[in-house]
Amino acid sequence: MPRIHFLDVTNRDGVQTARVNLSKFGKTMVNVYLARLGVAQSEIGFPFLFHEVPYVRAQVALADADALGDLRLSGWCRAVVADVEASTPLGLKHYNLSISTSDQMLQNKFKGRLDRAAIIRETQAAVRAAKAGGAETVGVNAEDGSRTDDGFLVEFALAAKEAGADRVRYCDTIGGDTPGRIGERFAKLASATGLPIETHCHNDLGMAVANSVAGALGDLDAGQDAWINTCVNGIGERSGNADLLSCILALRNGFGVADRVEIGDRLDLRWARRFSGWAAYAFGQPVPNNQPGVGANAFAHESGIHADGALKDHRNYELYDEDALGPFPDDWHATRGRVVLTGEYGGKAGFRHVMDSLGVEVADEELSFKLVQLCNASTGRPLTDDELRLIAAHPRELALLYPGLLA
């Protein structure tokens, strides 16, 4: 039976969000939380960019140290051979290679520099370069796929498949697709190409989650596995991307959906609230009160009829059990009243006090102490309990974020 998998793009599309910033250590924490949730794959960033190289090396080292569980790490590149060749020495085994496919983009972005034949040539060359460089899986991204006609999408996908591509990412780049349309297109494309068609949906019409679910169902109808792109808390360019938790909850609990799908990832939603709360803090974007599962009002009842029913049996007015989503963060740095913290300008006494208070065993005190200072300086905010625990457990791997620290 075909299965649904999640490929989270917080560390690529999410960090491109205007007016937000996330440090390389913050991006590392995203990968850690995705691993704890059991998500299949994280698109960790842009390995061909010079400032991403130390970060990518640190992620590969963490994966080698079993700090990221079964999480697969993938890099995003343009479908350009030079991007791929600059990336493959870093040791990533999974890639998505992106290029625009719609007439709108060919005419008004590329301005005639590339035509459809050139798009296919560039894509095939990039896929072959990735496979020659040791990639285990390669996906190709049809940017603006929702405005690309069916005929060229099939031609593009089959050409990529011939070159060795394993999946095609259908990008609803401007968020204009609708559930009925995208479901039908996915079923047709997956059937015609024999490839999984990966969802990448933006939320400009508020339908990113619905479109992602509909697209995935189209894959399943065609006998193909489905891959859904998500971001934590629905962060992303403009109005955001498909929210990770909302997609999971929809597939697990949606009427007419939950009984016909199988999720291939071994998900542990007990980390859902911790991840969401951390992301809101790290990105500086509060979680809306009505956010599914993690918003302050997601399980709140006030009106008489609802309150009475919920008190008798929460299932009267709640679709799923909040206990399955785990606790909200309760971090040391948020302690009110007298508290000793550790950070950029902290000393050894404060560092030891905080680590001891958290019950953390520090693998390398001197290196961990330096990392706390550096990570606090790069994030510009107090470090969370989970961040401190990661530093204490994997200082040598995290030191790769800061070239020269191990010299």
Model-based region annotation:
Residues I4-F6, D13-Q41, L62-A67, V81-L195, ...:
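Alpha/beta enzyme core
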Residues R19-G26, P47-H51, G75, A79, ...:
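Catalytic cores of large soluble enzymes that bind and process phosphate-bearing ligands
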Residues I4, D8-T10, L249-L251, A258-A407:
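A mid-to-C-terminal "edge-of-domain" accessory segment
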Residues A65-C77:
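A glycine-rich helix N-cap at a beta->alpha junction
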Residues F46-F50, C77-V81, I99-D103, A142-S146, ...:
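Active-site-proximal loop/turn and secondary-structure-junction residues that shape catalytic pockets
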Residues I174-N316:
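Catalytic alpha/beta core domains of metabolic enzymes, predominantly
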Residues H51-D64:
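Glycine-rich loop at the start of a catalytic domain that most often binds anionic cofactors/ligands
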Residues Q41-G45, R72-G75, G139-A142, E198-H200, ...:
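Short catalytic-loop micro-motif centered on adjacent basic/acidic residues
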